[in-house]
Amino acid sequence: MVKNGTRGERDLVKLLWEKGFAAMRAPASGGATKKPLPDIIAGNGEIYLAIEVKTTARERIYIDSEKIGALLRFSDIFGARPYIGIKFRYRDWIFLSPGDLELTPSSNYRLDLDIALERGRDLDEVTGNHRQTRLR
């Protein structure tokens, strides 16, 4: 899964560049440092994004609360919009704000494909290119 996650991050960085954003994978994200770093940092001089990237072949994904907390801390300091970018197999990228996620009894977060499609935004909406009404 790490291999697919890294590939997903690289693919998303490429897509962000194509949308006119300078974008990079954050070095040492994912636990190699104590600093709260997202997987991807991107900006175009007007909009700044901090993105925690997840890829999955399933229709449900779980995210550690520590990752969401770090994303929110970084975004607050940096002045970025925090997003979780999720690539479900055979689907385009879906972006959600941390508030769109469901808290589990163990204080982590869960996201089902149906909820992601209902609440999520596409890449154009996140980058300010148009307003998405729904992904379904």
UniProtKB/Swiss-Prot annotation:
GO terms for biological process: DNA recombination; DNA repair. It comes from the Archaea. It holds the Pfam family Hjc. The record marks 54 as: Transition state stabilizer. Mg(2+) binds at residues 9, 39, 52. Its cofactor is Mg(2+). CDD domains: Holliday_junction_resolvase. Optimum temperature is 55 degrees Celsius. InterPro entries: Hjc, Hjc_arc, Restrct_endonuc-II-like, tRNA_endonuc-like_dom_sf. Belongs to the Holliday junction resolvase Hjc family. A structure-specific endonuclease that resolves Holliday junction (HJ) intermediates during genetic recombination. Cleaves 4-way DNA junctions introducing paired nicks in opposing strands, leaving a 5'-terminal phosphate and a 3'-terminal hydroxyl group that are subsequently ligated to produce recombinant products. Cleaves both mobile and immobile junctions. Converts a synthetic Hj to nicked duplex products. Binds a variety of branched DNA structures but linear dsDNA poorly; cleaves only 4-way junctions. This is Crossover junction endodeoxyribonuclease Hjc. It comes from Methanothermobacter thermautotrophicus (strain ATCC 29096 / DSM 1053 / JCM 10044 / NBRC 100330 / Delta H). The gene is hjc.
